[in-house]
């Protein structure tokens, strides 16, 4: 069995490890266009039980990654300078580069070495394999090389966002909402190591225009955001890493496979970053596909059909929650008219996954109006 995996992100690396671990004789090749240890962004966040989903199938990887994660049990919403703590809503985070390095270790343990700085240039390079896996992100070359075989659609949200880091290690995942003469802004921020946090700045299009970001370079934009969130940063600096303004792409595919090619992770679909499920979905994709391949082996069509049948209902449920969350953010300037506690209630119920009854069960102090 010859397998080509395009993309050495979490989905591609973890799938390669799982396939080679369970079938030592398979030829598994991983190619990645970027240099090794070159990654954009800062941290990745996992909601609820972090990487608990790994424990049953892969205790070794679970035990390797878990000590490197930062965890917390509460969530904080800051509005009008007032922090509102929501107890019982925990998250965990890890630096994206650190996660990739740990997955590279797992891959080395089964003698697979990804080929970095190897950009696929032609569809001809996808020939000669029993299975081709597109784990090469939103702008997947593998997916695009097949024309409309997957029924791909992409729409873009209106809000602008830019991904930064900061040297301030925040105590919890925090959503900080602020306003100035230009308009309204939000920062999603959480620590992903003992000394660093991820800091995502978001604003609506009208605010972006009034602030004049279109005419600013990366350094000027960083300076503006540091001034804007000076109180939140408390003297710490923000860090840029190709931190350009973007619109979030909602990518969907009507079909997850075509012939012997299958889509994984962000090449298959995107889930808005506000619910912290993108990396988890990608790694769960890898688990599900590896199980289907183990069951069906050389019946590639059967394996890919079984993979989609098992995963699509789960993915669509989470993507629906992500879409609902994203729509709340698209209208966050309107929500900011609410008082801090009412605003926090609106925020925590935005995805439709936490109704008042469940909130009273998991966050009794917040739901009961107690100060934490």
Specify the residue positions occupied by each region the protein language model found.
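Conserved N-terminal helical subregion
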Residues: 48-163, 365-372
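Beta1/beta-strand and adjacent pyrophosphate-binding region of the FAD-binding site
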Residues: 1-11
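Conserved N-terminal glycine-rich FAD pyrophosphate-binding loop of Rossmann-like flavoproteins
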Residues: 35-53
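Glycine-rich phosphate/pyrophosphate-binding beta-alpha loops
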Residues: 252, 268-280
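Conserved FAD/dinucleotide-binding core of flavoprotein oxidoreductases
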Residues: 86-89, 95, 171-250
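C-terminal helical "tail/cap" subdomain of flavin- and related membrane-associated enzymes
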Residues: 21, 291-372
């Amino acid at each position: 069995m010859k397998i080509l995996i395009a993309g050495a992100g979490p989905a591609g690396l973890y799938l390669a490890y799982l396939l080679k671990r369970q079938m030592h004789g398979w030829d598994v090749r991983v190619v990645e266009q970027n240099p090794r240890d070159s990654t954009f962004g800062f941290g990745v966040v996992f909601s609820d039980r972090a990487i608990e989903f790994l424990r049953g199938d892969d205790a070794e990887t679970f035990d390797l990654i878990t000590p490197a994660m930062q965890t917390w049990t509460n969530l904080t919403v800051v509005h009008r300078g007032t922090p509102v703590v929501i107890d019982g809503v925990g998250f965990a985070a890890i630096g994206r580069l650190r996660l990739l390095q740990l997955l590279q270790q797992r891959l080395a343990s089964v003698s697979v070495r990804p080929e970095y700085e190897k950009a696929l240039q032609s569809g001809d390079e996808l020939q000669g394999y029993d299975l081709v896996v597109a784990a090469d992100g939103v702008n997947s070359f593998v997916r695009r090389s097949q024309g409309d075989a997957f029924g791909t659609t992409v729409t873009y949200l209106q809000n602008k966002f830019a991904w930064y880091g900061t040297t301030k290690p925040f105590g919890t995942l925090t959503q900080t909402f602020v306003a100035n003469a230009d308009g309204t802004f939000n920062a999603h921020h959480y620590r992903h190591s003992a000394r660093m946090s991820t800091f995502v700045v978001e604003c609506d299009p009208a605010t972006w225009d009034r602030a004049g970001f279109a005419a600013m370079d990366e350094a000027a934009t960083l300076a503006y955001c540091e001034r804007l969130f000076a109180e939140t940063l408390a003297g710490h600096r923000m860090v840029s890493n190709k931190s350009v303004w973007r619109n979030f792409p909602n990518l969907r595919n009507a079909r997850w496979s075509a012939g012997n090619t299958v889509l994984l992770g962000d090449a298959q679909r995107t889930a808005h970053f506000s619910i912290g499920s993108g990396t988890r979905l990608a790694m769960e994709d890898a688990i599900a596909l590896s199980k289907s391949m183990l069951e069906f082996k050389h019946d590639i069509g059967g394996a890919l059909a079984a993979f989609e049948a098992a995963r699509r209902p789960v993915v669509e449920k989470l993507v629906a929650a992500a879409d609902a969350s994203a729509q709340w953010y698209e209208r966050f300037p309107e929500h900011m008219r609410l008082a801090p506690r009412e605003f926090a209630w609106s925020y925590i119920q935005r995805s439709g996954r936490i109704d008042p009854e469940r909130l009273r069960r998991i966050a009794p102090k917040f739901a009961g109006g107690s100060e934490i």
